[in-house]
Amino acid sequence: MMAHHSMDDRDSPDKGFDSGKYVRYTPEQVEALERVYAECPKPSSLRRQQLIRECPILCNIEPRQIKVWFQNRRCREKQRKESARLQTVNRKLSAMNKLLMEENDRLQKQVSNLVYENGFMKHRIHTASGTTTDNSCESVVVSGQQRQQQNPTHQHPQRDVNNPANLLSIAEETLAEFLCKATGTAVDWVQMIGMKPGPDSIGIVAVSRNCSGIAARACGLVSLEPMKVAEILKDRPSWFRDCRCVETLNVIPTGNGGTIELVNTQIYAPTTLAAARDFWTLRYSTSLEDGSYVVCERSLTSATGGPNGPLSSSFVRAKMLSSGFLIRPCDGGGSIIHIVDHVDLDVSSVPEVLRPLYESSKILAQKMTVAALRHVRQIAQETSGEVQYSGGRQPAVLRTFSQRLCRGFNDAVNGFVDDGWSPMSSDGGEDITIMINSSSAKFAGSQYGSSFLPSFGSGVLCAKASMLLQNVPPLVLIRFLREHRAEWADYGVDAYSAASLRATPYAVPCVRTGGFPSNQVILPLAQTLEHEEFLEVVRLGGHAYSPEDMGLSRDMYLLQLCSGVDENVVGGCAQLVFAPIDESFADDAPLLPSGFRVIPLDQKTNPNDHQSASRTRDLASSLDGSTKTDSETNSRLVLTIAFQFTFDNHSRDNVATMARQYVRNVVGSIQRVALAITPRPGSMQLPTSPEALTLVRWITRSYSIHTGADLFGADSQSCGGDTLLKQLWDHSDAILCCSLKTNASPVFTFANQAGLDMLETTLVALQDIMLDKTLDDSGRRALCSEFAKIMQQGYANLPAGICVSSMGRPVSYEQATVWKVVDDNESNHCLAFTLVSWSFV
């Protein structure tokens, strides 16, 4: 059959083609054209002419016809890709529609149960009030307990641990309970805000309400086959960053083709102030009659029966209630995943101030349930080739770097004895904990690599601390630490860490309050689909490693992982972890991670909650305090800091002294940063002193005198002092005052709320900020050129420009007005600025 292509050939001089008819190509001609198309889909005019000369079989076809053939071929290819994309989207929507219909059925059952329970409780209350006047409330309590018995803890007789049939009985019970949670109404699920279903969304995410322990549930669609999904999810350390290890102690095949495993799972503690957790569980994997594959898991206890698991003094035994994942195949490929995590983390063993962290289903959802679903979706995208990373590295290699950074940081925070960590005597202060590790066995089999000790000396020293911060936005704090390293880091300490990668690291530096400024350049490597985590290389350049090499300036490199910075995430933690690397950046490069972790604590309305006396303070010291205040208006978070350094035997004490002082300096820097970025409600920060009222009156009156206009409109003339002050304080434009002295650099003396937000400071710290440090070069030149006019005419308008906040962030503004503020005696008091429509760049 002859291949053909449509085109109008009325203008063709070739009589071999009929005008207005289809131009037909022989199979040989099509094959020749396809070969060229595979090499170059859009050949130039010269290339098309060359093609006709090189291929005799195309000699009877005009160049214009060849051009049209390539145009149509590109169009068909585009249509084919679009058709395939639409078919994929249609399959996703069909699967998601099926998922939503099932979720709707489950919700209808849940509503029916709630209606029945509501009627039952009303009947019991009515019966109790009509038949007795007993004030013991026993009958009411009994009815109230009906709701609490949604998730009863079944008491099972002690089973023979050596009989596989008894373990299968436990497994089948676990499976039934898990399926009721995953697709039924065994748990009262509440959908998390911001989690909306769709073809490209993470899926449906819900958390538990009124059940024992904490629980989270997620369901979503991925383009992987069920068995591949099961393989990924069973490898918990690959996607759950807090998982230290999963050890399978026994594997028992079942008669129905399934598998029973006895598993010991160890979980890192997120902070330095609580012990790590472990689980002793039975894990059951099997196929269902409808073709689905399920992996469910539950703790083995005296209540459930089963063998006893290994115990470790470094871990607190937590309880896993029936959990797991259900994987169902989709028509046309892919899978629908239902994931349930239900645990009891034994909050009684946790300091009270940290208990919200262990009682939050939202945190569980983000750290485990959603993390699992995101990881599977990430693998699916990489498998399909939709994710492209720069630098020539495979996605799996970059994921391994991220895992090693997190694992190394978690090892440092936890400092397990069986890893070789041991505490070092303190200097009398309890704020910084120093631990050392000289175990060669530890490093030989760890993420550091077998060459760790030869490269890094005799061992590793870790300095760590935890702090309680109040009313500090976690994302803002982590972003600042990432973007403004020079504000908290010491260049000499960074250089020492980087020099540990060399054969002869130089002497231990003395910590300075302010190190050399360094040029920080962030080079992105990879990021996850939802952009909640990204891996990057940070280049710090400009200085020598040692005083002896001052002439040999050398760049330093850090491999850095920033996670949890998605503003739409509810209940998640954010962290910044980094490790020095050399220029080669090999795939097996040894990593010694340090960094920060910020975990928000849910707000509590219990007046007995322990509170910190100041905005930022050491968390450990607050545990023994007795100050108790209402925390309804306070948001709290825990900041954990850990820095690791290498040492030789002769330098251990010096490194410990340096590390302790360095971490204390970092803590002090973070306290200053936290003070500056803490949101301040305008009504609570509004200054109401007589001096403030007088200054505002001078500012507005001077503006009116010099410009002939009113600062806040015509109505402001009749306003009283308090009203005028509130208008200035709440004004959207930044209004600032600075000193007017000829013998000293001008400093800011007053600012409204917008001005404080723009400068990222407070009224107290404002007076330490100089005007010339805030304006950029063009702004300073513009002000100097207009200064004489300001002093003579009273005001001047400046063009749009850039200024810098106290945190080093650039701020743009569309226009600035500067005027001279005079007091009641017509004497010059200060200069006032209004920066219109300012925003962070």
From Swiss-Prot:
- Superkingdom of this protein's organism: Eukaryota
The subunit structure is: Binds DNA as homodimer. Interacts with ESR1 and ESR2. Interacts with ZPR3.
A GO CC annotation recorded here is: nucleus
**What organism does the record attribute this protein to?**
Arabidopsis thaliana (Mouse-ear cress)
The name under which this protein is listed is Homeobox-leucine zipper protein ATHB-9
Question: DNA-binding region spans which residues?
Answer: 18-81
Q: Which residues form a coiled coil?
A: 85-118
Query: Where is this chain's protein located in or outside the cell?
Result: Nucleus
Its ancestry begins with: Eukaryota, Viridiplantae, Streptophyta, Embryophyta, Tracheophyta
- What results from changing C55A? No effect on DNA-binding
Question: Of which family is this protein a member?
Answer: Belongs to the HD-ZIP homeobox family. Class III subfamily.
